[in-house]
Amino acid sequence: MTVDRRSVLRGLAAAALGGTVGCGRDPLARGRQSVSLWFSYGGKNREVLERMVARYNASQQAVYVQATFQGDYFEALAKLRTAIVAGAAPAMSHVVGEVVPYLHEAGVLEPLDGYPGAADLGLVRALAQEGTYTPTEPKPLVALPFNRSTPILYWNGSMLEKARLTVPDTWDALRDAAKALTNRSGDRVSTWGLECPISWWFWVALVGQAGGEVMRQDGYPLLGEEAGVEALQLWQRMVHEDRTMRPPPGRDYNAWQVTNQDFLAGRAAMIYTSTAFLRYLEDNATFPVRAAPLPGFRRRAVPTGGTFFVLMRGAPEGEKRAAWDFLRWMMLPDQTIEWATSTGYMPVATEAVTRLEQDGFYKKSPNDRVAMDQLQHAMPWPWAASLFRVQRECVDPRLEEAVLNRRDARELLAEARKQALEDT
């Protein structure tokens, strides 16, 4: 029997829907243009998104959005790529910023410039496509921001006050604070001074603070050059020499979850993680949660993170029009305010930021202001199709090896650069 590859892939893509295929449809969907959205928000953020989708569906009679959870960002992206090959992709999804150039160059993203109102969305430039990437020749609009973030420093307010410390704003001050906050009895540590996932995003922040860049505008993998080495060496020193930093176990977002849980349990006095977890940490902590910009070294620098909404070029025209109506609704100030104030992500509409300032939101919730203030130090990503592959295949696997096994940082980054160039 001949097995058709596309039939197999369509089956895999259908399985990726996670049980929604064949389920009874919401009566609200009858007589409307139905359109699918694959998403990756978990926990409280998932609840917020599903609430907003339900509100959109109830607000009009023409479009019905079927939102389906697909796992974390990387799990969802793997499913999306399988579905694209199979011709069974959803009309819309959201993807990490590092993969947008690759998907665009592959020709699978719908250009959005010609859709009604695309030129008048009023987005925060640093969070929108035009400000997220290094300037190159003009690119079509293919991605709309929504859950956008930066890494920030969180600390246990009670512990910092008890230790009579000020918030660290340099690498040296961070090391000193971590030493003062680490609680050790022999080889047993009850509280670590700092916990940070050993992953790409946080390493990129350190590279920028040391004055480096991960890539040139033409896509050449600099990997920070000497700054990349210094970034890894900071982690190595704090883990092995100072013994004040815990690298959390687990890969990808599992390590992020461990970091959050250790912080809430008092096992970490300070953590590096995303502003996306702000509301979750505040709601679940038994101590005052405080946030601050990441400490600098030669300069202040942070990468932006989170994801962009994208439309699939191969979707039926009716579904694309329906998806655009939903995405345009999600870009409106009311929706971006609801999303930001309910989660900790940054509002992507300039009018939303203005309204939050005028209403005194940031005075009442200063932690929410931290990521917005950091945008003045945001590092643009290169518009390079190889960026995501360099992240996932060349750099990420080596970071943990460098820190946990204390391999030579310069040697490992040279290996990563060599692999990146060979695969180009």
Residue ranges, per PLM feature:
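Extracytoplasmic "Venus flytrap"/periplasmic binding protein-like
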Residues: 55, 59-126, 158-169, 261-262, ...
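Conserved C-terminal helix/tail region of periplasmic/extracytoplasmic solute-binding proteins
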Residues: 161, 373-424
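Long, aromatic- and glycine/proline-rich binding clefts that accommodate carbohydrate-like moieties
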Residues: 124-134, 289-292, 341-393, 401
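Extracytoplasmic/periplasmic substrate-recognition and gating elements
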Residues: 58-59, 66, 139, 162-163, ...
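Hinge/lid segment of periplasmic solute-binding proteins
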Residues: 97-152, 175, 290, 360-365, ...
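N-terminal export signals
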Residues: 7-25
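Glycine-centered hinge/linker elements that transmit conformational signals in sensory
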Residues: 178-180, 220-252
